[in-house]
């Protein structure tokens, strides 16, 4: 269902810039970055950490960011079954933990760094680290009893709960981070300048177009905006602390 919505997003964007739509999905964040780095795709949606790494490694640029509930920031949250005795991330010691990817900023790096700053070793803290492949699959792992906790992007968790309110009855939040910039739509810095501006214009104008507004509504997005240069500063600072280990 999620992929169908993003396919509709890709199809809309492609029509706006006169291109054939091809929706590529890779199993890891690193592989998605490689698509952008080597020009195998024109535009991509990436997690915060892959964006920061792409920015550092080859100048990846944030073209636009989604605005959701009047905000362009989000959080990392760790969710657990409602029936769990856990009330904090520390209570998940020795338990099964799910995240989208090993380089997922909200799914792994933020909670893992918090554990390290509590003098814990995140690599040995959990009994099992499950790489679910996406945030919604991480939440599903908790719902299905395959994981005792999951680190996820709060935007995804909130959207899932909005569509299925029973999720809030079956899960609870045991950790919530400080706010950081929402994952962006990115391009390679060497992408043709005219195409880059066409893509940006299509994104920031989507909410004004009835067809575009329908696509956005299905994704739980109000509109796309051009990000301020400082939007990802807090994430950059946290990533530096993580990489300084």
Which positions does each model-derived feature cover?
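Extracytoplasmic small-molecule ligand-binding "clamshell" domains
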Residues: 1-52
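Short helix-initiation/N-cap motifs at beta->coil->alpha
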Residues: 23-34, 122-140, 179-181
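An extracytoplasmic/periplasmic, membrane-proximal ligand-sensing/linker region
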Residues: 1-8, 180-182, 186-245
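Flexible hinge/capping segments at coil-to-helix
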Residues: 80-101, 122-124
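Short beta-strand->loop
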Residues: 60-71, 125-128, 161-179
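Short helices/loops that flank or line small-molecule/ion binding pockets
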Residues: 30-44, 57-58, 90, 134-155
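A ligand-binding cleft/hinge motif common to bilobed small-molecule-binding domains
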Residues: 48-57, 111-117, 141-144, 148-168
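Ligand-binding cleft/hinge of the Venus flytrap
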Residues: 7-19, 107-131, 159-166, 237-242
């Amino acid at each position: 269902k999620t992929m169908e919505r993003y396919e509709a997003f890709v199809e809309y964007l492609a029509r706006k810039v006169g291109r054939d739509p091809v929706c590529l999905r890779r199993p890891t964040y690193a592989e998605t970055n490689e698509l952008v780095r080597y020009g195998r795709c024109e535009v991509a949606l990436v997690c915060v950490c892959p964006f920061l790494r792409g920015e550092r490694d080859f100048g990846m640029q944030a073209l636009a960011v989604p605005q959701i509930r009047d905000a362009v920031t989000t959080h990392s949250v760790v969710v657990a079954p409602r029936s769990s005795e856990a009330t904090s991330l520390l209570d998940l010691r020795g338990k099964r933990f799910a995240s989208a990817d090993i380089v997922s900023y909200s799914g792994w790096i933020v909670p893992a760094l918090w554990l390290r700053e509590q003098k814990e070793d995140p690599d040995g803290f959990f009994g099992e680290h499950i790489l679910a492949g996406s945030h919604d699959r991480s939440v599903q792992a908790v719902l299905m009893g395959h994981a005792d906790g999951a680190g996820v992007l709060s935007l995804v968790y909130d959207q899932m709960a909005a569509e299925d309110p029973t999720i809030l009855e079956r899960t609870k939040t045991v950790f919530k981070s400080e706010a950081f910039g929402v994952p962006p739509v990115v391009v390679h810095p060497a992408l043709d300048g005219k195409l880059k501006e066409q893509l940006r214009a299509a994104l920031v104008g989507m909410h004004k177009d009835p067809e575009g507004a329908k696509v956005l509504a299905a994704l739980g997005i109000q509109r796309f905006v051009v990000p301020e240069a400082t939007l990802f500063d807090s994430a950059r600072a946290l990533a530096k602390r993580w990489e300084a280990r």
